[in-house]
Each structure stands twice: as structure tokens, then as C-alpha cells.
Amino acid sequence: MYLYKKNYYGYAESLLDISISENNVEKYINDCFFILSIIQNNQVLILLFKSHFIGKQEKFNIIDKIFSAKIEKILVNFLKVIAKNNLFLYYKQILLKYIKLANSHLSQTWGEIETAFPISSVMTSSFESILSKKLGKKVHLRHKINSKLISGIRIIVDNQIFENSLFSELKLLKQNLKKHLITKNDL
């Protein structure tokens, strides 16, 4: 497993070198998020690209059909290389490692803002600004609707969770009630 880990980190580092040399790091980050989203929403693609019953050229044609008009040509070719080398199973780790390296290069980070309802881009920008000051680096947020929140927001940046929602309040209340019941039963 370590050998594969080293390999796919090498792929991410190579992609970073290319994006830096092309002065296109930010565009590649956005394209990587797009790729992750497409494959996440179409899990059958993973099975297709890791299958030994489908020829390499057929896989390349599928990659072209899905991605050619939407992302940089270098990234299309990059996907073909990992498919050719039977590393498509690790596409997510490779792309996430690239995003992490690229963010470090740009002194920025990405996070997710979850709400129970749609919010404006102005509000998202406001949260980005506040978090950028708090964390000391540029923060970009991607919006996601999470119906479990009921109301309020949850922001996740660099494994830190900033939350103010009815869901978190109910969860805390439930924990306190359990704790209270356990203590009462011990008496």
C-alpha cells in the first residue's frame, strides 16, 4: 500500500508543478473540484475506469466525452494517465492531495459552508472574509445544502468546524440528557 501512496502523491506533485509552470493553479483547483463532483455523483465511473474488461482507448474516449469541453486539456490527459496506469481507484486521493498542495502554494484553503437553505454569494463572501482574518490565510467556501441542519450554518475549514445550528443544539441537548440520566442511575 505504501508504494501506491507514494505513487499517487507523486502524481499530485507533478500536477502541481505543471499548474505552477502554466501559472494556472487556481483554475486547476476548480477543475479538480469539478472532476470530484462529477465522479461523486456518478459512482459507476469508478467501476468503469478500474475495470480490466474495458479497453484503454474506450476509457480515454469516455474521459474525453465527459471532461474535454469542461476542464483544462492537461487535466483530461492527466485523467487518462491515471486510467492507463490502473490508478483510477486513487483518483480522489490524488486530486485532494493536489488541492492541498496547491492551496499551500497559494497560501489559501478551501472549506464548505453548509446551510439548510440557499444563501447569497454576498453572504458566502462575508463568511470567507471573516474566516480569512481569523485563520490568517485566504479562505474559499463552497456552499452545500444540508437539510439535517434544520436552521443555522456549519462551516468546515481545515478540519475545524464552526457551527451554529438547531441540529447542533439538539445534539448537545441529547448528550446532556444522556449524561444526566447516567449520573442519576448511578445514584
From Swiss-Prot:
Its main location: membrane. F-type ATPases have 2 components, F(1) - the catalytic core - and F(0) - the membrane proton channel. F(1) has five subunits: alpha(3), beta(3), gamma(1), delta(1), epsilon(1). F(0) has three main subunits: a(1), b(2) and c(10-14). The alpha and beta chains form an alternating ring which encloses part of the gamma chain. F(1) is attached to F(0) by a central stalk formed by the gamma and epsilon chains, while a peripheral stalk is formed by the delta and b chains. This is ATP synthase subunit delta. InterPro entries: ATP_synth_OSCP/delta_N_sf, ATPase_OSCP/dsu. Belongs to the ATPase delta chain family. It is found in: Cell membrane. GO terms for molecular function: proton-transporting ATP synthase activity, rotational mechanism. F(1)F(0) ATP synthase produces ATP from ADP in the presence of a proton or sodium gradient. F-type ATPases consist of two structural domains, F(1) containing the extramembraneous catalytic core and F(0) containing the membrane proton channel, linked together by a central stalk and a peripheral stalk. During catalysis, ATP synthesis in the catalytic domain of F(1) is coupled via a rotary mechanism of the central stalk subunits to proton translocation. This protein is part of the stalk that links CF(0) to CF(1). It either transmits conformational changes from CF(0) to CF(1) or is implicated in proton conduction. It is a peripheral membrane protein. One of its GO terms (cellular component) is proton-transporting ATP synthase complex. Disulfide bonds: none annotated. Coiled coil: none annotated. HAMAP family: ATP_synth_delta_bact. It comes from the Bacteria.
